[in-house]
Amino acid sequence: FIEVKVLIFGQSGAGKTTLCKNIVKIMGDRVVHINADEVRKEADDWDFSEQGRWRQYRRMVNKAEEAEDMGKIALVDFICPYKSGREQFDADLTIFMSTVVNSKYEDTNKVFEWPHWTEYDYDINEWDDDDPVDVCWQIGKRIWEDECPTVQMLGRRQPWHEGHQALLDRCMEKAPQVDIMIRTMPWGDNNPFSVHEVEKNLREKLAHLAGIVSISIVPNI
């Protein structure tokens, strides 16, 4: 049963919603995307005074808790200008999108409290197409439990193919978690890819399973 809250905050125009939509494309219905504009629209409350902003905080916190109660990953997409408001979420993963320093909204610029680096887990200061996949695996780290029964899959994965996928499907029937262990092999005709190339390929192909699957690089066992 998953109970994970992810807060993605930053100025208007920083790319929060774009990031969230891409994560949803990857992780599917494991995730509930809680977008601040949609929540305001649902409440029909466009008051951006301090009182109005705090009402919005409470709505967003409640939506995140509802998603958790359903066993979903709560993906909170919110400017979240106040430090004290961010703390209310008690997020398992906090991502700061610092791609925009000042937005087009002067009232938001005045109240936005720029965070200290100790107040977030992950910073995106320039958009990269790999960001959604990277964030999926960051989420996965918060889901993974070392004490949970786990199957280990050991192999070269040069490259990942349908047979590997079929084996993974069988492994997931045996235990709630699977650790895919990539053997570090000497380069050659049978091993055309480095372990880091194999790892990158697996991270892209299996990002939808992050937290159910983990990827480890191990010696030539």
Predicted feature descriptions by range:
Residues 17:
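Walker A/P-loop
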Residues 88, 97-144:
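Small-molecule kinase domains that catalyze NTP-dependent phosphoryl transfer to phosphate-bearing small molecules
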Residues 14:
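ATP-binding Walker
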Residues 20-63:
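Conserved substrate/cofactor phosphate-moiety recognition/catalytic segment
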Residues 5-7, 152:
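Short hydrophobic/aromatic beta-strand immediately N-terminal to the Walker A/P-loop
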Residues 142-221:
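Nucleotidyltransferase catalytic core that binds NTPs
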Residues 11:
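P-loop (Walker A) phosphate-binding loop of NTP-binding proteins
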Residues 51-102:
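Glycine-rich phosphate-binding loop used to anchor ATP phosphates in small-molecule kinases
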